[in-house]
Amino acid sequence: MITPFIFIPRRKSLILPTPPSGDELGGIENMANPLKQLAGETAIYGLSTILARIINFLFVPFYTRLLTTASYGVVTEFMAYIAVLQVVLVLGLETGCFRFANREGVNPAAVYSNALATVFGISFSFLAFMVLFSGQIASALGYAGFENCIIYIGGILALDCTTAILFAKLRQEHKAFRFAIIKTVKILTETAANMVLFFWYPSHVNQFMGRFVSPTPDFTYVIFAILVSCIVCGIMFIPDLVRFTFKFDRKLLRQMLVYSIPLMVAALPGIVNDFLDRILFRYLDTNAEAWRSSLGIFQAAVKLSVIMNLFIQMFRFAAEPFFFQRAQNKGAKQLYAIVMEYFTAFCGLILLGVFLYLDVFSLIIGKDFRSGMGVVPIMLLSYMLLGMLFNVSMWYKLSGKTNMAIWITLAGLAVTVIVNVIFMPRYSFWAAAFGHLASYLIMFIISAVLGARYYPIPYSWKRISALFLLIGIICCLSMLSDALVFPGVNIGTSSALSEGLKLLLHTGLLLAYCAGCLVVLKGRYRQALAAEE
């Protein structure tokens, strides 16, 4: 998958298949403890993802100062298209490879040959289409004169979708370190390309580079940097391709597609739900002439919310093997319920940590983007609900009713569409933010209700509600104190004394939240240990 600086949520990896005899984790494979091996590999796979998110966040100050709001909006729109098209072009064959490569009597080489040939053919045919009609596509999107950017997107998709199968093969063979190394090199290449383009090229404009990017910083820099990283990634896979044994099996391919295409269809609502609002800005935003600016401002606010997403991603890496490992334990359900409470409390700490110091966080982004700072707490709460949704959704994974996930996601997608279509023409990016919040809330409620029916877990909704009440009280006290005691005091524009006192009070409120969490969760840690025995 792409690791661009514009955040794109990753497709979640499935449970890895039974490992082969070789082990590239640096030691002899421990067949007696596959879950320990899985957890170790998950941690390695997660390093590149977490690194991408961190670099992603670190580049926000540069992007929001070196790009206009409109240019940043264009990048956001393009990345939304890429995210959706990736799911379509891979056809779900990543997962299909895992399933068929482990079937008795099936040659894994034939499985990956079929998948690689199919995805390569489709994605590079799509690239050819983008090249042939780049002018028409650019004009239709309102980017006449930027045909090269359309071609870059086609190249990104072709290379990224093809290497997705090769990455799947590395996972199948448990070559976790090689997987992480290639991903990391790709991320660092993109970082270096961005540094060169934004900080060196504008003062060293030349005819050669002028064929690929604009002479002054704009969205072409970001897209071209991603393309360069995809090319480097493809080059690193050349040794694998040289050793690759191509065995095409038409019958096997048909079986793989019958299995994989429904998975692709099932994944589409989820990815569309995450990125639909970015696409709708073009058609529904309040100011039709400045919709790109609105989208850029919204995306900057989303970027400041990435700290919540980073924690959730790290939690997911650890939580899935944790949940599955204990699924058969007597006290498993009680343990899951307690985990949910601690997860909620920590997410609340992150939310308040940003909300109470929102003035400080606003200094990260450029002045032109700060009109969207009010959206940040809404997006933080949205992502918090998304993380809680992951927790309550374990029921259909543990009970085998994974088909329910499609309907839950479709319900969330419907809410996203309704909220944005009705409110975006009037409220612009505020509608997009509340669309996320409403969508994740509905999905959370539906999943929790169905989970109580099919796989009941004794969640303490009183404690969880108490935590949310505590978060709400702290937020209200913060806003009340700012209005009554520190009116007009903003970090960076007021006296040092008033700024210091304001930060001191907010720190006290954050400590009060921590103390409140200790009261709400009193005794639950011991109960978790008891449930583990």
Show where each model-derived region lies.
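Membrane-proximal transmembrane or re-entrant/amphipathic helices at the cytosolic face
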Residues: 6, 14-17, 24-28, 32, ...
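Interhelical loop/hinge segments that connect adjacent transmembrane helices in multipass membrane
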Residues: 18, 26-34, 38, 205-221, ...
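Specific pore-lining/lateral-gate transmembrane helices of multi-pass inner-membrane transport
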Residues: 102-118, 297-409
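Hydrophobic alpha-helical transmembrane segments
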Residues: 147, 151, 180-241, 266, ...
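N-terminal membrane topogenesis motif
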Residues: 2-57, 106-113, 144, 250-266, ...
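Helix-terminus/linker motif at the lipid-water interface of multi-pass membrane proteins
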Residues: 57-71, 138-140, 268-307, 325, ...
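Signature of the first transmembrane helix
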Residues: 33-94, 122-134, 154-156, 190-191, ...
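Transmembrane helical elements of multi-pass membrane transporters/channels
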Residues: 41-56, 186, 190, 221-237, ...
